[in-house]
Amino acid sequence: MQEDSKVYDITVIGGGPVGLFTAFYGGMRQASVKIIESLPQLGGQLSALYPEKYIYDVAGFPKIRAQELVNNLKEQMAKFDQTICLEQAVESVEKQADGVFKLVTNSETHYSKTVIITAGNGAFKPRKLELESAEQYEGKNLHYFIDDLNQFAGRRVAVLGGGDSAVDWALMLEPIAKEVSIIHRRDKFRAHEHSVENLHNSKVNVLTPFVPAELVGEDRIEQLVLEEVKGDRKEIIEIDDLIVNYGFVSSLGPIKNWGLDIEKNSIVVKSTMETNIEGFFAAGDICTYEGKVKLIASGFGEAPTAVNNAKAYMDPKARVQPLHSTSMFEK
């Protein structure tokens, strides 16, 4: 296992929207910041589940696409040189005798003066395709996450799933891919009615009610064999890529073993956003307090509170109330 011996001022666990804003704000307070994210990309559920959906309750935006909001947050954070660690799930956090936190992930050990957890509903993993041969194609042309739509340009793509994410991906891929098919085990899709209407009015090949039965190909998937649910029909389609979108399973997992005060699967915090462990803060949907409302907008307010109090924890002489951002950037 690798070890990064550098001790950061703030380590943010979770790279969703609140985590990204937390990292930006940490930079504003001149803190060294590291983000640890379990998924292959930043953006959390916004990027992984509904990148094309509009969000209407972020201040200053009448409406904004989820992925556009993530892109804006990444651009905002890029003002500072933050360290980003992807595909690392934090397994344990321990406050050592010297007050420094030791964070152990599935692949690396990290050290930090303070920790701010912004992990939403906890770590979430994709529901995987339950076919015997599926695992051998992961990392090749079987995908659970999509980082760049352009990688599918001119290719034949099949999407498995019937929810919002599956329908969104199929519609987004239609103008880019050579051919798009969506396969769902039921005749009716669970996605938003407007999205389903757009799907049926598109050139996407809709195959229902079918389930995947076999993946054919040596090094990569070349054919997808489908079987009709409660029927005898079979379909074989030639594909270059398979995207599985069966949803995600989220849980606090090992977070429950870190000594934090947890109430109804949320971490209890004070008005400073500090947990029962000094120097360990939480913001966003992962935390709870009296009157807590779980919204992205709320998390954006909690992030500066957590950062400013983390700064004061590290340096008692530091101002909890910061300067206005205009005085910091406009010189």
Swiss-Prot record:
Domain of life: Bacteria
UniProt keyword annotations, A-Z: FAD, Flavoprotein, NADP, Oxidoreductase
Keyword Cell inner membrane among UniProt keywords: no
Reaction it catalyzes: 2 reduced [2Fe-2S]-[ferredoxin] + NADP(+) + H(+) = 2 oxidized [2Fe-2S]-[ferredoxin] + NADPH
Keyword rRNA-binding: no
First-level EC class: oxidoreductase
Cofactor mode of binding and number, as noted: Binds 1 FAD per subunit.
Entry's EC annotation: 1.18.1.2
Pfam families: Pyr_redox_2 (PF07992)
Cofactor requirements of the protein: FAD
Binding, FAD: 37, 45, 50, 90, 124, 285, 326
InterPro entries hit by this protein: FAD/NAD-bd_sf, FAD/NAD-binding_dom, Fd--NADP_Rdtase_type_2, Ferredoxin-NADP_redctase_2
GO molecular function: ferredoxin-NADP+ reductase activity; flavin adenine dinucleotide binding; NADP binding
Similarity field: Belongs to the ferredoxin--NADP reductase type 2 family.
Assembly, per entry: Homodimer.
UniProt-recorded name of the protein: Ferredoxin--NADP reductase 2
Organism: Bacillus velezensis (strain DSM 23117 / BGSC 10A6 / LMG 26770 / FZB42) (Bacillus amyloliquefaciens subsp. plantarum)
